């Protein structure tokens, strides 16, 4: 198990745009180790997803996967998946709001609205191409993680900064994490 350091909001790397992953890169031992490290880091931090920029790697790589996550009680499981070079297209103007947190913004949450349904095109770690329509909680998770690849944090998407704060304060004043 190799857990990497997660960068925090304020680190300039988190604000940079990531480069696509090439099919040659996915064949390397270094790439395979990076993917293992990303999953180890995500699980250790009890995250639902992790993007490569969060550990200082400016590549378009996201890993997701979560069952019974204590940080987000009552949310559906997210199957493990490796997402490379994603392209997201909103399929509706309808949005849903969710109290989002981030491993790079520890101890805080903010209410973010995102498109309910998206189309996501991506490549997996074997070079297979995918094109899928995604909705619900999974769509929120994928959009949040893929934002990292463009140098965007969820705090950039807050419409109302009064709906942003520390977990403990929000727990007692808004009952959002019951």
Curated annotation (Swiss-Prot):
Residues that, per the record, bind Fe cation: 102, 144, 148
List the cofactors: Fe(2+)
Q: What does this protein do?
A: Removes the formyl group from the N-terminal Met of newly synthesized proteins. Requires at least a dipeptide for an efficient rate of reaction. N-terminal L-methionine is a prerequisite for activity but the enzyme has broad specificity at other positions.
Keyword entries, A-Z: Hydrolase, Iron, Metal-binding, Protein biosynthesis
Quaternary data: Homodimer.
> Reaction(s) catalyzed by this protein?
N-terminal N-formyl-L-methionyl-[peptide] + H2O = N-terminal L-methionyl-[peptide] + formate
Gene transcribed to yield this protein: def
Q: What is the lineage of its organism?
A: Bacteria, Pseudomonadati, Spirochaetota, Spirochaetia, Leptospirales
Give the top-rank taxon of the lineage listed in the UniProt record for this protein: Bacteria
EC numbers for this chain: 3.5.1.88
Q: Name one GO molecular function term.
A: peptide deformylase activity
* Cofactor details (free text): Binds 1 Fe(2+) ion.
**Known PANTHER family for this protein?**
PEPTIDE DEFORMYLASE (PTHR10458), PEPTIDE DEFORMYLASE 1 (PTHR10458:SF20)
Q: Which GO terms describe its biological process?
A: co-translational protein modification; translation
Instruction: Give the first-level EC class, as a single word.
Output: hydrolase
Q: Which SUPFAM superfamilies match?
A: Peptide deformylase
Q: Which Pfam families does UniProt cross-reference here?
A: Pep_deformylase (PF01327)
Q: Specify the protein name.
A: Peptide deformylase
The similarity annotation says:
Belongs to the polypeptide deformylase family.
Catalytic center at which residues?
A: 145
NCBIfam families (UniProt xref)? pept_deformyl, PRK00150.1-3
């Amino acid at each position: 198990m190799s857990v990497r350091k997660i960068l925090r909001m304020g680190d300039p790397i988190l604000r940079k745009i990531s480069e696509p992953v090439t099919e040659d890169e996915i064949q390397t031992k270094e790439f395979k180790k990076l993917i293992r490290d990303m999953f180890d880091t995500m699980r250790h931090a009890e995250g639902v997803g992790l993007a490569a920029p969060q550990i200082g790697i400016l590549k378009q790589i996201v890993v997701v996967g979560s069952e019974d996550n204590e940080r987000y009680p009552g949310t559906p499981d997210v199957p493990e998946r490796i997402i490379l070079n994603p392209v997201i297209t909103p399929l509706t103007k309808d949005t849903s709001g969710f109290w989002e947190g981030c491993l790079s913004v520890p101890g805080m949450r903010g209410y973010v609205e995102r498109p309910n349904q998206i189309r996501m095109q991506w490549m997996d770690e074997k070079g297979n191409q995918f094109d899928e329509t995604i909705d619900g909680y999974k769509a929120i998770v994928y959009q949040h993680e893929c934002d990292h690849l463009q140098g965007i944090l969820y705090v950039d998407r807050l419409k109302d900064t009064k709906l942003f704060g520390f977990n403990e304060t929000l727990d007692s004043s808004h009952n959002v994490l019951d």
